[in-house]
């Protein structure tokens, strides 16, 4: 795993919500994330290590309150972990590069994959394809 910043360094770099989500497996409140309604063309990166995670053309409105994607940029971009917390059986997704918590993946997405990668905005940064502007969740 590439991210080896200390907890103190990450606390200085990230907002309280970003730290909570990425380092403590937290979840931001639904419909509050800065990147939920972003419709620009570009790439969504890990907020912690900047590794590319999702292309904008795989993003869709699932109605769940968090940015949703049907496919990551590569198999290596995401790490999958069985999650049995909160009395549920889910699959947690983490950054394949730095192990930051991103959200969960569910088998109820659209074709071509049938998967819904439900991702906290607070774990993402977005790079605009046209002008290079960056937005952080």
UniProtKB/Swiss-Prot annotation:
The record's family statement is: Belongs to the MsrB Met sulfoxide reductase family.
This protein's record includes keyword Oxidoreductase: yes
Q: What binding details are noted for the cofactor?
A: Binds 1 zinc ion per subunit. The zinc ion is important for the structural integrity of the protein.
What region holds the MsrB domain?
Answer: 7-129
The organism's lineage is: Bacteria, Pseudomonadati, Pseudomonadota, Gammaproteobacteria, Enterobacterales
Q: What class of enzyme is it?
A: oxidoreductase
SUPFAM superfamilies linked: Mss4-like (SSF51316)
Q: List the disulfide bonds.
A: none
Give its E.C. classification number.
Answer: 1.8.4.12
Catalytic residue positions: 118 (nucleophile)
What keywords tag this UniProt record?
A: Metal-binding, Oxidoreductase, Zinc
Query: In its UniProt entry, what is this protein called?
Result: Peptide methionine sulfoxide reductase MsrB
One GO CC annotation, please? cytoplasm
| Residues noted as binding Zn(2+) in the record, renumbered to the chain | 46, 49, 95, 98
Kindly state which reaction or reactions the protein catalyses: L-methionyl-[protein] + [thioredoxin]-disulfide + H2O = L-methionyl-(R)-S-oxide-[protein] + [thioredoxin]-dithiol
Instruction: Please give the PANTHER family that the UniProt record associates with this protein.
Output: METHIONINE SULFOXIDE REDUCTASE, METHIONINE-R-SULFOXIDE REDUCTASE B1
HAMAP family (UniProt xref): MsrB
Which GO BP terms, alphabetically? Answer: protein repair; response to oxidative stress
Q: Which domain of life is it from?
A: Bacteria
Mind listing the GO molecular function terms for this protein?
peptide-methionine (R)-S-oxide reductase activity; zinc ion binding
Q: Give yes or no: UniProt keyword Metal-binding.
A: yes
Q: Name the needed cofactors.
A: Zn(2+)
